[in-house]
Amino acid sequence: MTTHTEPRDTSAVGKTKHPRNFIGTAMRVLTTVTGSEFAEKYQIREPINRIAYQATKTGFQTLGAANRAFKAAQGGSGKAKRLTSTPKDYFNLTPDDEQQMIAETVREFATEILRPAAYDADAAATAPEEILKRSAELGITMINVPEELEGAATERGVVTNALVAEAMAYGDMGLAIPLLAPSGVATTLTNFGSDDQQRTYLPDFAGENVPQSAVVIAEPKPLFDAFNLSTKATRVPSGYRLNGVKSFVPAAGSSELFIVGAQLEGKPALFIVESDSKGLIVEADPGMGVRAAGMGRLLLQDVAVPTSALIGEGESSAAAYRDVVRLSRLGWSALAAGTAKAVLDYVIPYVNEREAF
């Protein structure tokens, strides 16, 4: 199947013409981010400048590195880096000035880059590779990685991440899903990963070539229960063996890393699985309405992972799984809200301006 490198002249919503070409728009968005207080606060101006320079040379070609060799960074303290939340005296979900700026920047990116590409991406049932790499340039993944691991995060940003998801889905949910999936992996490793797991994987999520990845929970069965998984993990002398089928995996064919949910001794747990693991098979499984996400299934047939692949241990493993499920539900809700807002903004002027006869 051929994937168009240039989006069509019409968008998937309203069939409106492109305001700009892809490279020009992307460069303008990067320039906006580079000059913002957001870039200054999170110290991402320099890496974004490097990306912008590279973009002018390559025309935003993909610099992917499939199945890269993940290696632990040196100098670990043995203690994992954790982000904390700033306590507030009252419950208030109103975005502050910084969150508002981030949301507006992402929404502009989504409207001017994602939406024009959505029609072709949906037809091809895959997201264009050049678009899959753009989230790194906005710092979306970087703000979920602690500063000590080359990221930009100083505290947990649940509300900020929800605003980003809502703004991204305003452009197109199908493309937003694979773009945001690596942030879910980075957040999981930051919140629950061990020191060794964090040093092995998180630095890549703060770099210029973020690995495509996903947290994989869903399974292809009716009345799916996230806390009663059919995928099983069995202890073996060398670690664990995973068997089962996972579904609804975004950008499954191009992902380099998965965090897989599996039942371990009666309780759900999370395991880190690299894409080149023996026994791991990826099948295409397009999802209606989100075909652009490149959804697929993971077939795990005696996939061997080391002891260090388990996220958490004992009760902390189960607690990590519960929190990841809660956060994923919040993320899906934010995506739905962004999509609904886009529909509303299209329908209102259409109803007011249409001529029935």
Segments (PLM) and residue ranges:
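Internal helix-loop-helix
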Residues: 75-79, 107, 137-209, 251-257
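Glycine-rich beta->alpha junctions and the first turn(s) of the following alpha-helix
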Residues: 95, 282-357
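His/Cys-centered metal/cofactor-coordination and adjacent catalytic loops
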Residues: 127-128
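A short, Trp-centered hydrophobic/proline-enriched beta-strand micro-motif
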Residues: 208-218
